[in-house]
Amino acid sequence: MRRRDLLAGAACMAVSSLVPRVGAARGRTPYGGRILLHAPWPLNAIDPHRVDDMAAAFFGDALFETLYARDADGAFIPSLAEGDPQPDGATLRITLRSDIRFAAGARVDARAAAASIARARAHDAAAWLADVPAPHIDKGVLVFAMRDARRLVRALASPLVAIVPPRFAPDRPDGTGPLRVEIQAAGMVLSRNGIAASGPAFLDAIDVRRAADLVTSLRDFESGADDMGWLGSFLHDPRPGAKSFDAGVIGWAILRTGRDAAAADTPGTAQALADGIPHAALAPLVVGSPWDQGSATWTGAPADLVVRDDAPWLVEVARALCAAMSQPSHEVRCVTLPAAEIAQRRASRGFALMIDVARPIGPGPLGALVGLATADDPASAMALARHPPRGDVAPRVATRTMRIGVVGEIKLQGGRAPDVVLPPSPWGRGVDWGNAFRSR
Protein backbone atom coordinates (compact mmCIF):
# COMPACT_ATOMS: atom_id res chain seq x y z
CA MET A 1 0.00 0.00 0.00
CA ARG A 2 1.26 3.47 -0.87
CA ARG A 3 1.42 6.18 1.78
CA ARG A 4 -0.73 8.56 -0.22
CA ASP A 5 -3.34 5.89 -0.90
CA LEU A 6 -4.11 6.18 2.78
CA LEU A 7 -5.16 9.78 2.30
CA ALA A 8 -8.04 8.99 -0.02
CA GLY A 9 -9.65 6.62 2.44
CA ALA A 10 -8.80 8.62 5.52
CA ALA A 11 -9.55 12.16 4.38
CA CYS A 12 -12.70 12.36 6.50
CA MET A 13 -11.56 10.13 9.35
CA ALA A 14 -10.01 11.10 12.64
CA VAL A 15 -6.27 10.82 12.91
CA SER A 16 -6.69 7.97 15.38
CA SER A 17 -8.06 5.80 12.60
CA LEU A 18 -5.26 6.81 10.23
CA VAL A 19 -2.34 5.74 12.40
CA PRO A 20 -3.15 2.01 12.55
CA ARG A 21 -3.59 1.90 8.79
CA VAL A 22 -0.19 3.49 8.29
CA GLY A 23 1.26 0.89 10.61
CA ALA A 24 -0.44 -1.88 8.67
CA ALA A 25 0.98 -0.56 5.44
CA ARG A 26 4.45 -0.64 6.96
CA GLY A 27 4.00 -4.36 7.59
CA ARG A 28 3.64 -5.04 3.87
CA THR A 29 6.48 -2.86 2.60
CA PRO A 30 10.09 -3.17 3.82
CA TYR A 31 10.82 -0.45 6.33
CA GLY A 32 14.27 1.08 6.75
CA GLY A 33 17.45 1.36 4.73
CA ARG A 34 19.17 4.24 3.00
CA ILE A 35 19.83 5.36 -0.55
CA LEU A 36 23.03 7.13 -1.61
CA LEU A 37 23.39 9.09 -4.84
CA HIS A 38 25.29 11.99 -6.38
CA ALA A 39 23.44 14.78 -8.19
CA PRO A 40 25.05 17.29 -10.61
CA TRP A 41 22.84 20.10 -9.36
CA PRO A 42 22.95 22.80 -6.65
CA LEU A 43 22.09 21.31 -3.26
CA ASN A 44 22.75 24.23 -0.90
CA ALA A 45 19.11 25.33 -0.66
CA ILE A 46 15.62 24.28 -1.68
CA ASP A 47 12.61 26.53 -2.25
CA PRO A 48 9.31 24.99 -3.40
CA HIS A 49 7.95 28.38 -4.48
CA ARG A 50 10.54 28.95 -7.21
CA VAL A 51 10.05 27.82 -10.78
CA ASP A 52 13.84 27.57 -11.31
CA ASP A 53 14.66 25.41 -8.27
CA MET A 54 15.72 22.01 -9.55
CA ALA A 55 16.35 20.61 -6.07
CA ALA A 56 12.67 21.29 -5.40
CA ALA A 57 11.75 19.71 -8.73
CA PHE A 58 13.68 16.54 -7.86
CA PHE A 59 12.96 16.22 -4.14
CA GLY A 60 10.37 18.84 -3.15
CA ASP A 61 7.37 16.51 -2.99
CA ALA A 62 9.17 14.45 -0.35
CA LEU A 63 9.69 17.48 1.88
CA PHE A 64 6.70 19.74 1.33
CA GLU A 65 2.99 19.12 0.99
CA THR A 66 0.01 21.09 -0.24
CA LEU A 67 -3.53 21.60 1.02
CA TYR A 68 -4.68 19.21 -1.69
CA ALA A 69 -2.74 16.42 -3.34
CA ARG A 70 -2.99 14.29 -6.44
CA ASP A 71 -3.60 10.58 -6.00
CA ALA A 72 -2.34 7.73 -8.17
CA ASP A 73 -5.40 8.04 -10.44
CA GLY A 74 -4.85 11.75 -11.02
CA ALA A 75 -7.73 12.89 -8.80
CA PHE A 76 -7.29 15.70 -6.29
CA ILE A 77 -7.80 14.73 -2.65
CA PRO A 78 -7.42 16.55 0.68
CA SER A 79 -3.91 16.45 2.12
CA LEU A 80 -3.25 19.14 4.72
CA ALA A 81 -6.87 20.22 4.35
CA GLU A 82 -9.44 18.32 6.37
CA GLY A 83 -11.81 17.93 3.43
CA ASP A 84 -13.14 19.57 0.30
CA PRO A 85 -13.79 23.33 0.23
CA GLN A 86 -17.19 24.03 1.76
CA PRO A 87 -19.46 26.63 0.12
CA ASP A 88 -20.68 29.46 2.32
CA GLY A 89 -22.58 32.05 0.32
CA ALA A 90 -20.15 33.60 -2.14
CA THR A 91 -17.13 32.06 -0.43
CA LEU A 92 -15.39 28.73 0.01
CA ARG A 93 -14.11 27.64 3.42
CA ILE A 94 -11.16 25.28 3.94
CA THR A 95 -10.52 23.75 7.34
CA LEU A 96 -7.03 22.43 8.00
CA ARG A 97 -6.37 19.19 9.79
CA SER A 98 -5.76 19.84 13.46
CA ASP A 99 -3.14 17.13 13.94
CA ILE A 100 -0.30 18.31 11.72
CA ARG A 101 3.05 19.95 12.41
CA PHE A 102 6.05 20.98 10.40
CA ALA A 103 9.10 18.74 10.74
CA ALA A 104 10.71 21.26 13.11
CA GLY A 105 7.68 21.01 15.40
CA ALA A 106 5.61 24.15 14.74
CA ARG A 107 1.88 23.70 14.21
CA VAL A 108 0.37 24.01 10.76
CA ASP A 109 -2.63 26.29 11.13
CA ALA A 110 -4.67 28.64 8.98
CA ARG A 111 -2.32 31.58 9.59
CA ALA A 112 0.71 29.58 8.51
CA ALA A 113 -1.15 28.34 5.42
CA ALA A 114 -2.30 31.84 4.46
CA ALA A 115 1.22 33.22 4.89
CA SER A 116 2.62 30.39 2.78
CA ILE A 117 0.11 31.01 -0.02
CA ALA A 118 1.07 34.69 0.07
CA ARG A 119 4.77 33.75 -0.15
CA ALA A 120 4.09 31.46 -3.11
CA ARG A 121 2.21 34.27 -4.85
CA ALA A 122 5.05 36.73 -4.17
CA HIS A 123 7.54 34.31 -5.72
CA ASP A 124 6.67 32.30 -8.83
CA ALA A 125 3.09 31.08 -8.29
CA ALA A 126 1.36 34.40 -9.00
CA ALA A 127 0.12 33.41 -12.46
CA TRP A 128 -1.06 30.00 -11.29
CA LEU A 129 -3.01 31.72 -8.50
CA ALA A 130 -4.37 34.44 -10.78
CA ASP A 131 -8.01 33.44 -10.19
CA VAL A 132 -7.55 32.67 -6.50
CA PRO A 133 -8.00 35.63 -4.14
CA ALA A 134 -5.91 35.90 -1.00
CA PRO A 135 -7.77 34.14 1.81
CA HIS A 136 -8.84 35.68 5.06
CA ILE A 137 -9.12 33.74 8.30
CA ASP A 138 -12.36 33.24 10.17
CA LYS A 139 -12.26 31.23 13.39
CA GLY A 140 -9.21 29.29 12.25
CA VAL A 141 -10.63 28.55 8.79
CA LEU A 142 -9.30 29.77 5.42
CA VAL A 143 -12.00 31.70 3.56
CA PHE A 144 -11.67 32.36 -0.18
CA ALA A 145 -13.98 34.84 -1.91
CA MET A 146 -14.80 32.57 -4.84
CA ARG A 147 -17.36 29.88 -5.73
CA ASP A 148 -15.48 27.48 -8.01
CA ALA A 149 -14.26 24.75 -5.64
CA ARG A 150 -12.75 22.69 -8.43
CA ARG A 151 -10.59 25.57 -9.62
CA LEU A 152 -9.52 26.38 -6.07
CA VAL A 153 -8.47 22.81 -5.32
CA ARG A 154 -6.53 22.54 -8.57
CA ALA A 155 -4.67 25.76 -7.83
CA LEU A 156 -3.84 24.85 -4.23
CA ALA A 157 -2.56 21.41 -5.26
CA SER A 158 0.36 22.87 -7.22
CA PRO A 159 3.79 21.96 -5.83
CA LEU A 160 4.62 25.67 -6.11
CA VAL A 161 1.90 26.39 -3.55
CA ALA A 162 3.37 24.00 -0.98
CA ILE A 163 2.79 24.94 2.65
CA VAL A 164 5.89 26.11 4.50
CA PRO A 165 6.22 27.77 7.91
CA PRO A 166 6.42 31.53 8.44
CA ARG A 167 9.94 32.91 8.02
CA PHE A 168 10.81 29.97 5.78
CA ALA A 169 14.52 29.88 4.87
CA PRO A 170 15.59 27.93 1.74
CA ASP A 171 18.92 27.02 3.35
CA ARG A 172 17.05 25.63 6.39
CA PRO A 173 13.97 24.16 4.71
CA ASP A 174 11.07 22.86 6.78
CA GLY A 175 7.89 21.12 5.66
CA THR A 176 5.33 18.43 6.43
CA GLY A 177 6.44 15.76 3.95
CA PRO A 178 7.50 12.16 4.62
CA LEU A 179 11.14 13.24 4.73
CA ARG A 180 12.90 16.16 6.39
CA VAL A 181 16.08 17.67 5.02
CA GLU A 182 19.37 18.88 6.44
CA ILE A 183 21.60 20.95 4.18
CA GLN A 184 25.24 19.99 4.62
CA ALA A 185 28.52 21.00 3.00
CA ALA A 186 28.58 17.81 0.92
CA GLY A 187 24.95 18.02 -0.16
CA MET A 188 21.68 17.25 1.60
CA VAL A 189 20.40 14.43 3.77
CA LEU A 190 16.72 13.57 3.57
CA SER A 191 15.73 11.60 6.67
CA ARG A 192 12.45 10.11 7.78
CA ASN A 193 10.01 12.64 9.23
CA GLY A 194 8.34 10.86 12.12
CA ILE A 195 5.54 13.44 12.34
CA ALA A 196 4.82 13.66 8.60
CA ALA A 197 1.27 14.71 7.78
CA SER A 198 0.62 11.71 5.50
CA GLY A 199 2.90 9.26 7.25
CA PRO A 200 6.69 8.95 7.38
CA ALA A 201 8.81 7.60 4.55
CA PHE A 202 9.66 3.92 4.30
CA LEU A 203 13.38 4.70 3.99
CA ASP A 204 15.49 5.85 6.91
CA ALA A 205 17.29 8.38 4.74
CA ILE A 206 18.38 9.47 1.29
CA ASP A 207 21.90 10.90 1.08
CA VAL A 208 22.17 13.25 -1.90
CA ARG A 209 25.75 14.36 -2.41
CA ARG A 210 26.90 17.12 -4.70
CA ALA A 211 28.60 15.86 -7.86
CA ALA A 212 31.32 18.10 -9.26
CA ASP A 213 30.82 16.65 -12.74
CA LEU A 214 28.74 14.15 -14.71
CA VAL A 215 31.28 11.36 -14.26
CA THR A 216 31.14 11.05 -10.48
CA SER A 217 27.66 9.57 -10.25
CA LEU A 218 28.26 7.01 -13.00
CA ARG A 219 31.65 5.99 -11.60
CA ASP A 220 30.36 5.56 -8.05
CA PHE A 221 27.26 3.69 -9.17
CA GLU A 222 29.32 1.37 -11.35
CA SER A 223 31.63 0.59 -8.42
CA GLY A 224 28.70 -0.12 -6.09
CA ALA A 225 29.37 2.87 -3.83
CA ASP A 226 26.15 4.63 -4.91
CA ASP A 227 22.67 3.15 -5.12
CA MET A 228 21.59 5.29 -8.08
CA GLY A 229 23.34 6.51 -11.21
CA TRP A 230 22.39 9.90 -12.63
CA LEU A 231 21.38 9.68 -16.32
CA GLY A 232 23.08 6.31 -16.79
CA SER A 233 24.12 2.98 -15.33
CA PHE A 234 27.87 2.82 -15.84
CA LEU A 235 30.98 4.67 -16.95
CA HIS A 236 33.11 1.78 -18.23
CA ASP A 237 31.44 -1.55 -17.47
CA PRO A 238 27.84 -2.40 -16.53
CA ARG A 239 27.20 -3.00 -12.85
CA PRO A 240 26.02 -6.59 -12.27
CA GLY A 241 22.28 -6.74 -11.60
CA ALA A 242 21.72 -3.02 -12.10
CA LYS A 243 18.26 -1.90 -13.17
CA SER A 244 17.25 1.20 -15.07
CA PHE A 245 14.64 3.76 -14.07
CA ASP A 246 12.94 6.63 -15.87
CA ALA A 247 10.94 9.04 -13.72
CA GLY A 248 10.18 11.35 -16.62
CA VAL A 249 10.59 15.02 -17.39
CA ILE A 250 10.74 17.33 -14.39
CA GLY A 251 11.74 20.55 -16.16
CA TRP A 252 13.59 22.11 -19.06
CA ALA A 253 16.92 23.67 -19.84
CA ILE A 254 16.07 27.02 -21.41
CA LEU A 255 18.01 29.57 -23.45
CA ARG A 256 17.42 33.24 -22.64
CA THR A 257 18.21 36.29 -24.74
CA GLY A 258 19.05 39.53 -22.94
CA ARG A 259 19.66 43.20 -23.68
CA ASP A 260 23.23 42.57 -24.81
CA ALA A 261 21.95 40.35 -27.61
CA ALA A 262 20.90 43.57 -29.40
CA ALA A 263 18.82 42.73 -32.48
CA ALA A 264 18.54 39.10 -31.39
CA ASP A 265 16.71 40.08 -28.21
CA THR A 266 13.24 39.59 -29.66
CA PRO A 267 10.43 37.12 -28.86
CA GLY A 268 10.96 33.83 -30.65
CA THR A 269 14.69 34.23 -31.31
CA ALA A 270 15.76 32.11 -28.34
CA GLN A 271 13.58 29.21 -29.45
CA ALA A 272 14.75 29.53 -33.05
CA LEU A 273 18.36 29.36 -31.87
CA ALA A 274 17.59 26.37 -29.65
CA ASP A 275 15.85 24.59 -32.51
CA GLY A 276 18.93 25.16 -34.65
CA ILE A 277 21.08 23.04 -32.33
CA PRO A 278 21.50 19.47 -33.64
CA HIS A 279 19.97 16.93 -31.27
CA ALA A 280 23.17 14.89 -31.53
CA ALA A 281 25.10 17.73 -29.86
CA LEU A 282 23.02 17.33 -26.69
CA ALA A 283 21.95 13.68 -26.86
CA PRO A 284 24.67 12.48 -24.42
CA LEU A 285 23.06 14.71 -21.78
CA VAL A 286 19.70 12.89 -22.12
CA VAL A 287 17.63 15.90 -23.18
CA GLY A 288 14.66 14.03 -24.62
CA SER A 289 13.51 13.04 -28.08
CA PRO A 290 14.90 14.66 -31.23
CA TRP A 291 13.24 17.87 -32.41
CA ASP A 292 12.71 19.26 -35.88
CA GLN A 293 16.01 21.04 -36.39
CA GLY A 294 15.76 24.59 -37.69
CA SER A 295 18.25 26.66 -39.63
CA ALA A 296 18.73 29.60 -37.26
CA THR A 297 22.27 30.35 -36.10
CA TRP A 298 23.92 33.04 -34.01
CA THR A 299 24.72 35.89 -36.39
CA GLY A 300 25.50 38.59 -33.85
CA ALA A 301 28.86 39.82 -32.61
CA PRO A 302 30.95 37.48 -30.45
CA ALA A 303 28.99 36.98 -27.24
CA ASP A 304 29.07 35.27 -23.87
CA LEU A 305 26.59 32.59 -22.89
CA VAL A 306 26.42 32.69 -19.10
CA VAL A 307 25.45 29.82 -16.81
CA ARG A 308 25.59 29.26 -13.05
CA ASP A 309 28.79 27.56 -11.97
CA ASP A 310 27.28 25.17 -9.38
CA ALA A 311 25.16 23.12 -11.80
CA PRO A 312 27.49 20.71 -13.66
CA TRP A 313 24.78 19.30 -15.92
CA LEU A 314 23.69 22.77 -16.95
CA VAL A 315 27.29 23.82 -17.56
CA GLU A 316 27.72 20.88 -19.95
CA VAL A 317 24.56 21.93 -21.78
CA ALA A 318 25.96 25.46 -22.11
CA ARG A 319 29.29 24.18 -23.42
CA ALA A 320 27.55 21.99 -25.99
CA LEU A 321 25.47 24.96 -27.16
CA CYS A 322 28.50 27.20 -27.47
CA ALA A 323 30.31 24.62 -29.57
CA ALA A 324 27.29 24.14 -31.82
CA MET A 325 26.42 27.84 -32.19
CA SER A 326 29.89 29.31 -32.71
CA GLN A 327 31.16 30.18 -36.17
CA PRO A 328 33.95 32.46 -37.39
CA SER A 329 33.32 36.08 -36.33
CA HIS A 330 30.21 34.96 -34.44
CA GLU A 331 31.75 33.01 -31.58
CA VAL A 332 29.74 32.20 -28.48
CA ARG A 333 31.81 31.71 -25.33
CA CYS A 334 30.62 29.77 -22.27
CA VAL A 335 31.10 31.77 -19.06
CA THR A 336 30.31 30.30 -15.65
CA LEU A 337 29.23 32.69 -12.91
CA PRO A 338 28.13 32.41 -9.27
CA ALA A 339 24.42 31.82 -8.79
CA ALA A 340 23.94 35.24 -7.18
CA GLU A 341 25.40 37.03 -10.20
CA ILE A 342 23.27 34.94 -12.55
CA ALA A 343 20.19 35.99 -10.59
CA GLN A 344 21.22 39.66 -10.72
CA ARG A 345 21.86 39.56 -14.46
CA ARG A 346 18.60 37.73 -15.09
CA ALA A 347 16.67 40.38 -13.16
CA SER A 348 18.33 43.25 -15.05
CA ARG A 349 18.50 41.33 -18.35
CA GLY A 350 22.16 42.35 -18.46
CA PHE A 351 23.47 39.54 -20.66
CA ALA A 352 23.47 38.40 -24.28
CA LEU A 353 22.68 34.71 -23.83
CA MET A 354 21.97 32.66 -20.72
CA ILE A 355 21.27 29.01 -19.97
CA ASP A 356 18.68 28.62 -17.24
CA VAL A 357 16.01 26.20 -16.03
CA ALA A 358 12.25 26.13 -15.55
CA ARG A 359 9.73 23.57 -14.34
CA PRO A 360 5.98 23.03 -14.64
CA ILE A 361 3.79 24.85 -12.13
CA GLY A 362 0.83 22.50 -12.34
CA PRO A 363 -0.48 19.41 -14.09
CA GLY A 364 -0.87 18.89 -17.81
CA PRO A 365 0.00 21.15 -20.74
CA LEU A 366 -1.34 24.26 -18.98
CA GLY A 367 0.93 23.70 -15.98
CA ALA A 368 3.90 23.39 -18.32
CA LEU A 369 2.89 26.46 -20.28
CA VAL A 370 2.40 28.65 -17.20
CA GLY A 371 5.73 27.45 -15.80
CA LEU A 372 7.59 28.49 -18.95
CA ALA A 373 5.69 31.77 -19.21
CA THR A 374 6.54 32.57 -15.58
CA ALA A 375 10.22 31.93 -16.29
CA ASP A 376 9.98 34.32 -19.24
CA ASP A 377 7.85 37.17 -17.84
CA PRO A 378 5.55 36.90 -14.80
CA ALA A 379 3.23 39.65 -16.09
CA SER A 380 2.67 37.88 -19.40
CA ALA A 381 2.22 34.61 -17.52
CA MET A 382 -0.61 36.17 -15.54
CA ALA A 383 -2.47 37.10 -18.73
CA LEU A 384 -1.84 33.67 -20.21
CA ALA A 385 -3.14 31.89 -17.11
CA ARG A 386 -6.36 33.90 -17.25
CA HIS A 387 -6.79 33.34 -20.99
CA PRO A 388 -5.08 30.04 -21.84
CA PRO A 389 -4.83 28.87 -25.45
CA ARG A 390 -7.20 26.24 -26.72
CA GLY A 391 -5.88 22.73 -27.02
CA ASP A 392 -2.51 21.36 -26.01
CA VAL A 393 0.52 23.47 -26.87
CA ALA A 394 3.94 21.80 -26.88
CA PRO A 395 6.65 23.59 -24.86
CA ARG A 396 8.81 24.32 -27.91
CA VAL A 397 5.80 25.84 -29.66
CA ALA A 398 4.69 27.90 -26.66
CA THR A 399 8.06 29.62 -26.34
CA ARG A 400 7.99 30.95 -29.91
CA THR A 401 6.33 34.08 -28.53
CA MET A 402 8.75 34.41 -25.58
CA ARG A 403 12.31 35.53 -24.96
CA ILE A 404 13.22 32.04 -23.80
CA GLY A 405 13.61 28.84 -25.78
CA VAL A 406 13.43 25.22 -24.71
CA VAL A 407 16.85 23.65 -25.28
CA GLY A 408 16.04 20.22 -23.90
CA GLU A 409 14.25 18.29 -21.20
CA ILE A 410 15.60 17.76 -17.71
CA LYS A 411 14.96 14.13 -16.91
CA LEU A 412 15.27 12.06 -13.77
CA GLN A 413 16.50 8.74 -15.04
CA GLY A 414 19.48 6.43 -14.87
CA GLY A 415 20.47 3.25 -13.06
CA ARG A 416 19.48 1.81 -9.70
CA ALA A 417 20.63 -1.00 -7.47
CA PRO A 418 18.45 -4.10 -7.96
CA ASP A 419 16.85 -3.79 -4.51
CA VAL A 420 15.98 -0.10 -4.84
CA VAL A 421 12.32 0.49 -5.71
CA LEU A 422 11.39 3.95 -7.00
CA PRO A 423 7.63 4.46 -7.46
CA PRO A 424 6.59 7.26 -9.84
CA SER A 425 5.19 10.49 -8.49
CA PRO A 426 1.40 10.86 -8.76
CA TRP A 427 2.13 13.96 -10.82
CA GLY A 428 3.76 11.82 -13.48
CA ARG A 429 7.01 13.73 -13.03
CA GLY A 430 9.76 12.44 -10.77
CA VAL A 431 9.98 9.85 -8.01
CA ASP A 432 7.62 9.39 -5.08
CA TRP A 433 10.48 9.34 -2.58
CA GLY A 434 8.17 8.85 0.39
CA ASN A 435 7.07 5.51 -1.06
CA ALA A 436 10.55 4.45 -2.23
CA PHE A 437 12.02 1.45 -0.43
CA ARG A 438 14.66 -1.26 -0.53
CA SER A 439 13.26 -4.73 -1.15
CA ARG A 440 14.45 -7.68 0.91
Feature map (PLM): residue ranges:
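A structural "hinge/loop" feature
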Residues: W41-A57, L80-A81, A106, L152-V161, ...
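Detector for C-terminal structural segments
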Residues: A185, A272-T297, W313-C322, R346-R440
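Gly/Pro-rich hinge or "lid" segments in bacterial periplasmic/extracellular proteins
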Residues: R150-D207, A212-T216
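Surface-exposed binding/hinge segments that line
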Residues: P85, R93, A126-F168
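Alpha-helical secondary-structure segments
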Residues: D109-S116, V143, D204-A205, S223, ...
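Aromatic- and charge-enriched surface segment that lines or borders ligand/interaction sites
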Residues: F59, G83-D124, D220, A263-D265
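Extracellular/periplasmic solute-recognition and catalytic clefts
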Residues: E182-V189, D207-D260, V357-A358
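N-terminal lobe/hinge region of extracytoplasmic solute-binding protein
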Residues: H38-G89, A118, D174-T176
